[in-house]
Each structure stands twice: as structure tokens, then as C-alpha cells.
């Protein structure tokens, strides 16, 4: 697909399992993106801690028509849960998101701009920070080498 001069559709795929403690901050960070995603797909793997009710309430309270929420009748495990979400996503660019991620407001805008300017890119990752509970920075992780990236792709099952 030639991406130049078109607006790419963005899909965010979130998976949850008993993540109520961190989830509201994460959902707010998605809602506050400078470049709103075209769709947010949330897949819950049978939570029992109030996660399901939190997500349903958040979507309803914020009138998020482009957000879809799925609850597995039977547990699938995190990898299958993510893979199902990625398969259902309709966007040109897919952003997987863990339930405890908090995204900077410019994440989608900046990463999408890079993809639009460089259509040859198939996989783009960004730096991240690991935070302690109160928000103090535990570690900042910078650019991975191609070998590390390939290892991550293979280990987490994003290839056949």
C-alpha cells in the first residue's frame, strides 16, 4: 500500500485481565491522545476484579462509539487474547497496548507521522519508561538494536 498523501487509520488493541488497579489511567491516556485513534478494541480475558465494569462504565461515560469491548467467555491467555485483537483491528497501523501502559499525549501523532513519512517501515517501536507506583521513574529504556527487536517479535508470537 502506498501511504503517502493519505491519512492512515489507527487501531489501538488493548488486552486486560484483572487490571482494574491501573486501567483507568491507561484508558484516560488513550482518550487524551492528540491524534485520536480511529478505533480502540479492548479484549478482556475473563477478569474478576471489576475490570469489566470499569471498562464498560468508561466507554459509556465518555460516549466512545469507536471503542469496542469484548469479554472472553473462556480464558485464552494473554498471547491469544492479543492475537485475536490484532486480527479484528481494521486500521492501517496497529498499536498494541498493555493494561498498565500510560501513553504520552503525542505518542499516536508522532509515531503515525513517522509511518506516513516512511511507508517502507513495517514495525516501529518507541522508548519507554518503567515507573514505580507513585510515578517515580524506575528506568528509561532506549532504542533496541535490530537483533533485540527480532528476538522480541519472535518471543512474543507476532510472527508465524
Set out the residue ranges of the language-model regions:
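Nucleotide-sugar donor-binding/catalytic module of glycosyltransferases
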Residues: 2-160
Amino acid at each position: 500500500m502506498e501511504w503517502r498523501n493519505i491519512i492512515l487509520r489507527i487501531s489501538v488493541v488493548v488486552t486486560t485481565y484483572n487490571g482494574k488497579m491501573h486501567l483507568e489511567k491507561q484508558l484516560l491516556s488513550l482518550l487524551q491522545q492528540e491524534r485520536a485513534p480511529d478505533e480502540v478494541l479492548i479484549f478482556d480475558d475473563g477478569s474478576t476484579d471489576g475490570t469489566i465494569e470499569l471498562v464498560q462504565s468508561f466507554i459509556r461515560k465518555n460516549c466512545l462509539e469507536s471503542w469496542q469491548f469484548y469479554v472472553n467467555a473462556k480464558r485464552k491467555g494473554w498471547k491469544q487474547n492479543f492475537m485475536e485483537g490484532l486480527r479484528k483491528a481494521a486500521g492501517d497501523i496497529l498499536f498494541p497496548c498493555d493494561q498498565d501502559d500510560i501513553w504520552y499525549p503525542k505518542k499516536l501523532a508522532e509515531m503515525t507521522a513517522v509511518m506516513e513519512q516512511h511507508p517502507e517501515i513495517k514495525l516501529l517501536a518507541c522508548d519507554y519508561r518503567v515507573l514505580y507506583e507513585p510515578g517515580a521513574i524506575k528506568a528509561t529504556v532506549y532504542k533496541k538494536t535490530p537483533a533485540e527487536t527480532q528476538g522480541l517479535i519472535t518471543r512474543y508470537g507476532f510472527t508465524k
